Amino acid sequence: IIDSILGAIRKKDIGTYFPNTKKFKNIRSPKMLKPIIFDLNKSNLIINNLDINLICQKPRVSKYRNKIIKSVSKLTGLNEKQINLKGKTVEKLGLIGKEKAIACEVIISITKYD
């Protein structure tokens, strides 16, 4: 979500804001998201919606969909109806298919307001 916001507002990637240093070691994603949302709002931009693809063999996303959407809603200030979450598998291919990794893709729509 953070990188999708940064891309939409034409900023650098997450590593620029939170480099791989001792200061940010084990930092939790919600703590990183807060200043990014602040920058978004400061730029007079609002999020219209998020479309999230969670790519994993297990667990089945459908089991956790509502909980994840509620969490993202709380962290972003978006209405749950503005967040779409889909689960995808890779049919047991690669590290994701072997349940050793999970990937996520996020598409964001934003609008500038005055």
Regions found by a protein language model. Name each.
Residues 1-67, 75-76:
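RNase III-family endoribonuclease catalytic core
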Residues 63-65, 94-97:
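Short, well-ordered secondary-structure micro-motifs
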Residues 70:
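Active-site phosphate/pyrophosphate- and oxyanion-stabilizing loops and adjacent acidic/basic residues
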Residues 74-77, 106-108:
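Short, surface-exposed linear patches
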Residues 79-82:
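Short acidic capping loops at alpha-helix termini that bridge into adjacent secondary structure
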Residues 85-89:
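Pyridoxal 5′-phosphate
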Residues 96-114:
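C-terminal edge-of-domain segments
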